[in-house]
Amino acid sequence: MFRNWTQDDRVARYCRWYPHKDISETEWFLKNCCLGAEYSWAITLIGKDEPIGGIDVVGENDVGVPEIGYVLAHEYWGKGLMTEAVQAVLKELFRCGFEKIGACHDINNPASGKVMEKCGMTYVRKSMALKKFGSDEQCEIKCYEISRP
């Protein structure tokens, strides 16, 4: 995680966490955020045993719809990998019994919205959210949802 994305300013720009300064921050983040998640996946390349990103159910939105969040190492942006990963996770979450799934992105990161649209998600609203954990700064987000087919 640290080598591939948590220390990268380009990746952290649109995430709710600041770039990690050293591996101990990533270790803390992993222990306190990711490992407790009931639905959490690492993204890897076929035949490789190194994570290049992740997808998690990060909570519920204000109307009780579970939301996913995702991240990918910068060198893999724009190659269709996140769309493939999100499609697989949505399929698995629906298989597990979820009826509706949501996702949101910072309006300054329209590529993330394109991933959501390619995965069949529909725009539902704009909202405001904390830009970074531990900050009072807000950012505008676009929210999408998809219902079980």
Task: Walk through the language-model features, giving the residues of each.
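Acyl-donor (CoA/ACP) binding surface of acyl/acetyltransferases
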Residues: 1-8, 13, 40, 44-149
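Short loop/turn motifs at secondary-structure junctions and domain boundaries
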Residues: 32-37
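Conserved GNAT-fold acetyl-CoA-binding loop/helix
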Residues: 10-31
